[in-house]
Amino acid sequence: MAKKPVMLCIMDGFGWTPDETYGNAVVAANKPHLDALMKNYPMTTINASGMAVGLPDGQMGNSEVGHTNMGAGRIVYQQLTLITKSIKDGEMFKNPVLVKNMKAAIDAGKAIHLMGLVGTGGVHSHADHWFGVLEMAKHMGATKVYLHCIMDGRDTDPHSGKGFLADLQAKLDELGIGTIASVSGRYYAMDRDNNWDREEKAYAAFVYGEGNHAANAQEAIEASYADGKTDEFVIPAVTCEGGRVEDGDTVIFMNFRPDRARQMTRIFCDDAFTGFERRGGRKQVHYVCMAEYDATMPNCEVAYPPVELSNVLGEYLSKNGKTQLRIAETEKYAHVTFFFNGGVEAPYEGEDRKVIPSPKDVPTYDLKPQMSAPEVADECKARIESGKYDVIVLNFANCDMVGHTGVFDSAVKAVEAVDAAVNEVVTAVLNAGGCVFLTADHGNAEKMKNPDGTPFTAHTTNPVPFVAIGCGDVKLREGGCLADIAPTMLPYIGLPVPSEMTGKSLIVD
């Protein structure tokens, strides 16, 4: 007998502030299907940032955090919050992995290298963590400390990197240790789509001292701006000739979010890496990941291991014999699988996964704002019609990925592409007798411009919509958060809410 699926449809980066029209691609878009769904079915807004998702107050949400909270059915305190707390209470200075690996370099007269995203974006890393590790290195007596700074410009203003580098240099001057050895854009050093040609350029700067050259970090970033390249696209530049990573050194990757730290970590740590030829083979370094990037990664240690989550939605469905599908294009595949499952890499029994390749024929997604949404929708529709699944978790990447480009007209087209795709899958679910919970993981496309008209490329702290489609004439409450979604879904799946899920249903009895 064909199953009546319960779908969670996630419009990545689709924040909801209909009264703020300036620079709002969500409002500007022609989206008849979404407008009708929001008008004709019960709708509320839910919080997707700050303490509501386990981040510090006022911190914008992001895809990793959003999917983790949705899948867990409880507020999950994030690595950002946990690491910041460990600095404040002094626990970082006793962290056994950091102590051991720093000591190994110091005792051998070798260098400590800090590598990672610089700034206060808080999505992949945070300046406070750099400052904490630098203070720890000083406290332990380190003298050779080199910084390999990856510039942001996606989760922060595209020209904010200059200020972040100045703040970092001021800290180095204050402590009297550390030299910025290289500056690279995240486009090169933090790829997640196996564009090894990009990563190779960043690696060459870190290890061989090859690439552009500048006298210091400020000169490197100013030269990049003068060349029309914002933070994200800074061509890897060497700013200290003696700062190369060498055998016996300690490397600490400062990012706490896994997805964009995995590839560079694999280059340094995996003997079996084949993405490009590493001259002289793998560097024999002591490698520390700030958080766990991949449980299967060899030759590295994790400073802050993941908090174990039990009875997340995927696990709970599997235990109860339910079938489930996770589907997204490449850019968000990890989010509907690894992150939604609370950091578990392998699928649960009864969990099928389908990844649709993200476009490779464009360098940035503003040039193809529909991305692979039509293909995701077509595949999902076929899976719905198969009658095989009790639960489907689907992500459309467009509003987030195109939102990050800062190109307003393209973001509008991205919203319109999502409108068409959502209509296709919602219609299929309703025709199958199922229901859809339509939402987003965080805001982005609803704020594409700064007040002065310059592009705004980061996420926002805005709420996101939550629409209950085909769920009956229910009333939805205000003031909820992403952790409340799984407890809202479970009664429609025919299961009680497990005690581990502390989120509360968004449906008012």
Where in this protein do the model-derived segments appear?
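Feature captures the catalytic ectodomains and active-site-proximal regions of enzymes
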Residues: M1-D509
